[in-house]
Amino acid sequence: MSAFCLTESQAGSDAGAIAATAVRDGDTYVLNGTKQWITNAGEAEFYTVIALTDRAKGTRGVSALVVEKNDPGISFGKKEKKMGIRASVTREVVLEDCRVPKDRLIGKEGLGFIVTMKTLDNARPGAGALAVGLAQGALDEAASFAKERHQFGVPIFSFQAVQHLLADMATRIEAARALVYAVARYIDSGPKDYCKEGAMAKLFPTDMAMQVTVDAVQVMGGHGYMREYPVEKMMRDAKILQIYEGTNQIMRNIIGLALNKEYSRKK
């Protein structure tokens, strides 16, 4: 199991603002800094740490190194209490004079920001796929409930208001599924850059999953709000999909900048 250590208390959406350092010392690098909200922290065996090797160069002075769980100088914070995705562990990763061999450097010094962006570009369609699966589960739960739940002597599925909610849910899911598959096929074709497409494959499906899970709770009414039913958990889990791997506002920034470049070239 591995973990990707990028986020810091002052470096969330602004990945270039990281403060963690990796200083070359002979045949080793000495790492110092704290990474925040790291999935699998304390459980993973390997940690890809994004740190500054040359502060003066800005993002070109960022490098990526591998730290192992048992290396001296690495420790972990408390297990965070989260709104959702409670099945995964989230902790701080603390590096205090953590010394690692120079061959733990990924690629060359200064390539860390590129490693980070490529990692996120590849991870974002995965978040979209998670969103599609989560939303499909919420629809299945809501539709099954609507068939069984009776009000005014008939199943609530027979009410047009409920049918419209379910129809919108199903349509949004299929649209998001098609987008995720299309982007996956595009990435498999080997394009030089797919930053825009990766952002799209995260943005639309994750916004969709949030809406669909909220609507699933609405279809189920008071039952949906209770912890005995899974849709309230699905709604809580859906929220993080709009936040991690780059917030959906950042996704819109990425898409907008890419479109601006594309249409500038067409003039």
Give the ranges of each region predicted by the language model.
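Alpha-helical interface subdomain recognition
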Residues: 12-15, 24-29, 92-97, 108-111, ...
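Short, surface-exposed charged micro-motifs
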Residues: 19-21
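Short, charged, solvent-exposed linker or helix-capping segments at domain edges/interfaces
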Residues: 61, 75-78, 101-109, 267
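Basic, amphipathic alpha-helical recognition segments used for DNA target recognition
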Residues: 67-72, 102-103, 136
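Flexible, small-/acidic-enriched active-site or ligand-binding loops
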Residues: 72-99
